[in-house]
Amino acid sequence: MKKYENIVPVFDNTRRKTVYGTLLEGTDDKRFAQTSFEWEIERQRIRRKRQTQGLSFPEHSHWDWNQKIENAKRYPDVLTVFAIEYNGQIQGLMIVDHVLFHAKLPPDSGYPLLYVRYIENAPHIPFPNCFRGLD
C-alpha cells in the first residue's frame, strides 16, 4: 500500500479538535485481511446487540472487504482502494471507480467521474461517530 505524503484532516468529535490521518492507496493484503477480520468481529458484536434491542443494523454490515479488495485488484485500471489511517488503525475504507462513469449534465457532459462504489467507516468508531470529515 502506498502512503501519501499529504495528510488528511479529520475532526475528532470526542476531543473537539482537528487531527491528521494518512491517506493510503492500493492494497496491502496482510493489513487489509487483519482489518477485515477485526471489523467483522466488531460488526457481529454490534449486530447481536442491535438485534436484542429490536433495532436494524446498517446495510453494509454484511460486507466482506477481503472479497471487495480482491475484486478491485483484478481491475486495477478501473478500481482503486483508499483507506484513511489514524493512530495506527484504519478508520475508513473506500473503493472508487475512475473509468466507467461519465458526467451526463453540462458543462461536464462526457467527462469522467469518480464513482464511489463502496465506503465504510470502521465499526469500532463509537456513536456518536468519533471522527468526521472536514468541509
Range-by-range predicted roles:
Residues M1-L134:
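Non-catalytic substrate-recognition and accessory regions of acyl/acetyltransferase enzymes
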